[in-house]
Regions:
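Acidic/His/Gly-enriched intrinsically disordered linker/tail segments
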Residues: 19, 44-108, 133
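Short, surface-exposed helix-loop/turn micro-motifs enriched in polar/charged residues
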Residues: 21, 40, 44-48, 121-122, ...
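Hydrophobic/aromatic-lined pockets within catalytic cores
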Residues: 30, 34, 38-42, 57-61, ...
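Edge beta-strands of extracellular beta-sandwich domains
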Residues: 232-245
Length: 245
């Protein structure tokens, strides 16, 4: 990296934060935890190495420059996701998955972090993975199950969506300001997709499904429910409907 900041002088996020530190030093150091401490049994599951390590760049940025800097960096690297093939590769034939295992993997973790909406617990999960799977070879299923169990949230459909398909889930929603109600559902997703969404302004958790639901929200929550706020924290698309479905 010629002893310079960024990756060969470039900021992979386009946010400016990636030029504050040496990409190679930060990224490769992250592999001491995910790859060297926890290693996958099959390279088809290499997202466990690269997705978590790529997310360490977001955590590093957040630690030194603040939470919004970390959000900026993570949102910025999203532009590098191609979604041409799934992150998980073919098993038993020495076949890695898509190169999206880096940035899409990192955005998946950022998404799950905000769905949990408990940073203390989220960091406990990261440490717990490295403690409980210390110097072991693992499968993605073990990692997925660990996160679901430790977070007390079943993220299986979330992992299936992001690791095993190239679809970006879309949150369809209609805001009825007069009635202080929100109608919402998941679209462009696998059957049974049920990833929770936390309204970060108040901490209220929604549990969308593929069928429309309606909920009462206060003025602060309705005001927060905008494309820019939602997509910044979650790797999803949003579609605000112009009429009540």
């Amino acid at each position: 990296n010629k002893f310079g900041n960024g990756y060969l002088g470039r900021d992979l996020s386009g946010s400016g934060w990636g030029l504050k530190w040496d990409y190679i030093i930060v990224h490769e150091s992250g592999h001491e935890w995910f790859a060297n401490n926890i290693t996958t049994k099959d390279i088809a599951d290499m997202w466990v190495h690269e997705g978590f390590t790529d997310y360490s760049e977001t955590l590093f940025t957040e630690y030194y420059y603040g939470i919004e800097a970390g959000n900026d960096y993570n949102f910025g690297i999203r532009k590098n996701i191609q979604n041409e093939s799934p992150i998980i590769g073919l098993y038993g034939v020495n076949k890695e998955g898509s190169n999206d295992m880096y940035t899409k993997g990192a955005n998946l973790l950022h998404t799950i972090r905000h769905a949990i909406n408990n940073d203390s617990l989220f960091r406990q999960i990261l440490r717990g993975l490295n403690k409980d799977f210390y110097h072991q070879t693992v499968t993605t299923q073990q990692v997925e199950s660990y996160i679901s169990k430790a977070s007390h949230t079943n993220f299986q459909k979330t992992f299936d969506q992001y690791l095993r398909t190239v679809q970006i889930p879309q949150l369809d929603y209609f805001v009825d300001s007069a009635a202080a109600k929100l109608t919402y559902r998941w679209a462009n997703c696998i059957d049974g997709f049920d990833m929770p969404i936390t309204i970060l302004a108040t901490g209220k958790k929604l549990q969308p499904s593929t069928k429309f639901k309606t909920i009462k929200l206060d003025a602060t929550e309705l005001k927060w429910f905008k494309k820019a706020n939602i997509e910044r924290q979650y790797y999803i698309k949003t579609q605000q409907l112009i009429s009540n479905p």
